[in-house]
Amino acid sequence: MAQSPMISVPLKATNEIDWVEPLKRYIRDTYGDDPERYAEECATLNRLRQDVRGAGKDSTSGRDMLYRYYGQLELLDLRFPVDEQHIKISFTWFDAFTHKSTAQYSLAFEKASIIFNISAVLSCHAAAQDRGEESALKTAYHNFQASAGMFTYINENFLHAPSSDLSRETVKALIHVMLAQAQEVFLEKQVADKKKPALLAKLASQAGYLYSQALEGVQENVTKAIFEKVWLLMTQIKSNLLNSMAQYYQALADEEQDKHGIAVGRLQTAETQAKEAERVARSFPNSVPMSSNLSADCGGFLQELTKRHLSTVQSQLQSALKDNDYIYHKEVPAEASLEAVAKLPAAKPIPVSELYAGQDIQRITGPDLFAKIVPFAVTESASLYDEEKAKLVRAEAERVDTANGEMAASLDYLRLPGALQVLKGGFDQDILPDEDFRQWCEDVSDQENPVTLFDSLRTEKDSILSILDKSTKQLDMEEGVCEKMRSKYENEWTQQPSSRLTTTLRGDIRHYREALDEASRSDNQLAGKLRQNEMDFDEMRRAAKSGEADQLFQRAVAQARARGSNATSPAGLEPNLLDDDFDEGPSVIDQINRVEDILKKLNSIKRERNQVLKDLKEKAHNDDISQILILNKKSISNYEAQLFEQELEKFRPHQNRLLQANHKQSALMKELTSAFNRLLQDKRVQSEQSKYETIQRQRSSVINRYKRAYQEFLDLVAGLQSAKNWYAEMRETVESLEKNVDSFVNNRRSEGAQLLNQIEQERSSNKNSQAEMERERLRGLMDRMSMDPNKSSPQPQQNRPTPPSQYQQSQAPRYPQTNYQGQYQQPNSPPPQQAQQQAYQNFSPPPTTTTTQSFGPPPINTFVQPTYNPSQYGRTPGPTSPPPNQTSFNIGGYRGPASPPPNQSTFGQSQSFGGYGASSTPQTQGGYVPPGFVPPPPPPGPPPLGPQQTFHYGNQPNSAHPNSAYPQSAMPPQQQQQQQQQQQNDPWAGLNAWK
């Protein structure tokens, strides 16, 4: 059976354009991004544009291709302004009917043309369906409505049409044609389903009405030479045919209602309209223009359709007239007096948003090509939205924290759930110590036993005292030998008294002894602390080594309980409270279970609340409305706050759940407080509570005891370590003092030996001098008795000149004064290098080679040890003591043998000096050093800071920092060997045995 032909809209043609370069240029200039990053996206868009030029007009693939490109244009318009001022691209399209070209730089023109082609493709696809099949008929019905919807979108959104095919009049006419054809297709389906004539009449009446509306627009466009004339003929045929069908089916409905006269009148009207349709169909040309988009046999189909309908109407009219004339005799009304047939719309424009109803639009349009590019305005709006989200999350988090804090505070005030554990399980678990106690025992065990430390300190102190005793004995022995020699030789013994030279050394020894006394007192304090806590220390040490810290704690608690005035039985023997339910009312176990149930509910609410908050934070973090903001970019400024409020509503369920959790918690906390108070008021619970508090006090007392012992142990270990360091530093100091004493004694012994040798030589020389003088006197007498006047008495010559003693007052650095405060402190002594510089600022370090005796001035840069050198104080001709006010040696200025003055107490710093030898002949001033002489080290510094000691340093010239280490002197091995050899040949060495 031939089906009614349908009108389809031709597609607009277009020229090729280039999207790539303009887009890249705009990305680089406006967004400041590398355009090559978007090369693929630009190429994809350009390829879509090329594909739409060849889109098929009668297939769904062509429709999808056009829609995909249109969707990308919509997304592109949200990021790129395509117009004459920004991205300038000329879009050229040809009119679908007149084929005239139109070029514009507006993206709206490009989108309108694409939508027009989508509508055209939909109409072509609908017209090409074989409506004999139900699925094809439904497709045609849907596509005609969708085409009308797309044309409606053009009319509503593109107001200024640049071409005639996009004008409002043309598009409106096309909308009516598409809707009329959709209504006709629906009517065909109802006719095929043999629906009631009344329904068919209404559907046909609506179709005829739509064709009549379309006829006006088509007539106007044909007049303007836009549409082909065959469209006008076809619209006229369809209008008359559908109106005739409406009258025909309404007549059948009237006959069913016994309205035979009215039925005859309607059939007569239907015949008139059918004849008019047949007449126009006969005038339809056999060949149609290509631009009309109609098939070549369209005219034949229309003629056959109208002829068949006219035959049907005439046959029914004859039958109705016959029946009415012979049977019913009803009056036949005139055509003008007939009521209009009611209309039933069955077709309406399908909006663009419903074009792909039930399908994945994202799959058809594809992903947003330029999703990585976000406009600045959208970024700002997204930031504002993020801040709104953050406010919401912060507010909910604060509510959750507040609720959790209130729960924790209430449970802590009620001492739950710990109190329940005590009531249920007794006190066994409370006798166990905490982890701190175990750690205290481990720390005590890891440290060295204080008793061992005390023994080592005592040994160290005894060693230091023995060194000081030895040094004192050496100084006393040297002083005794010197005074015995002075008593023997009287004025001839010119060596400086030792007591004036050993003031500093003896003072240091005295100070060191005092420091040791102070240290002993501090040691006694530490020992007292050890005696007081030694038992606890030993217990903790043994418990840690044997792994019995818990048993130690339990024994201590048991002892504390036994010492109590009201001692109770051990916890293990306490009757269980849960087994002792003898009062009336609810049992204790029931009350405890009730409280535990409430606690479980509270904990469940807390977990649920925390989880809801976590989900809320995660959802807010993942919530990104950038795409929504982009889609609404053009209107976001008008309703931004409204959009934010709408989007934040998605978090409302989480907020409601948190609010409900808080309400539940408040109710449960009230119930918990009431139930727990009733439990505590039970006499059985009160009795056990009193016992528990007693045990807790005992446990706390044990904890405090061992905590105090542990703190005492830490203090003791710290004090012993400080004492150990102090004694080690003190030992270094007294060893340095011992070396200085040895050097001083050796130097004095060498000086005394030279002085003794000189005295013996002078006595021998004096005897020879008296004999010579006697001979000279006799010779003089003989000369006077002689008669020769040329002879004269010779003048006696002085055998040796007496060099003037030269003293230069030099200022030697003094030891800093010491203030003893009785506390162990780290000694602040100058380091060896600084102390060496303090004593010998003008000299280089001594050479390690053996020093030989030399006469004459030393060469330049030759080291001359600035120390106390006995060879420089020989009797030439006799000793000359320094002035009484001299307090230090001036080594660089002596020209004769002289001991330090009586009041000198330190070795001075001075320049290099010259000395005289043992010979009676004058010697050139030079650096004479006797064989084997070992220069003594600088005097020692103050003792280390002992108990209650604090050094106070004044402003001393050329002094080192007070925190420096003590100086240490060392004697080269070769010099020690030479000194031993000299002592073997020392004639004064035997004087050491004097008593």
From Swiss-Prot:
Question: A Pfam family this protein belongs to?
Answer: BRO1
Annotated Polar residues bias? 789-818, 862-874, 904-925, 948-973
Biased composition (Basic and acidic residues) is annotated at 772-786
Q: Where is the composition biased (Pro residues)?
A: 932-946
Which domain of life does this protein belong to?
Eukaryota
Give compartment(s).
Answer: Cytoplasm; Endosome
N-terminal signal peptide: none
Gene Ontology CC terms, in alphabetical order? endosome
Q: What is this protein called?
A: Vacuolar protein-sorting protein BRO1
Organism, per UniProt? Gibberella zeae (strain ATCC MYA-4620 / CBS 123657 / FGSC 9075 / NRRL 31084 / PH-1) (Wheat head blight fungus)
**Name of the encoding gene:** BRO1
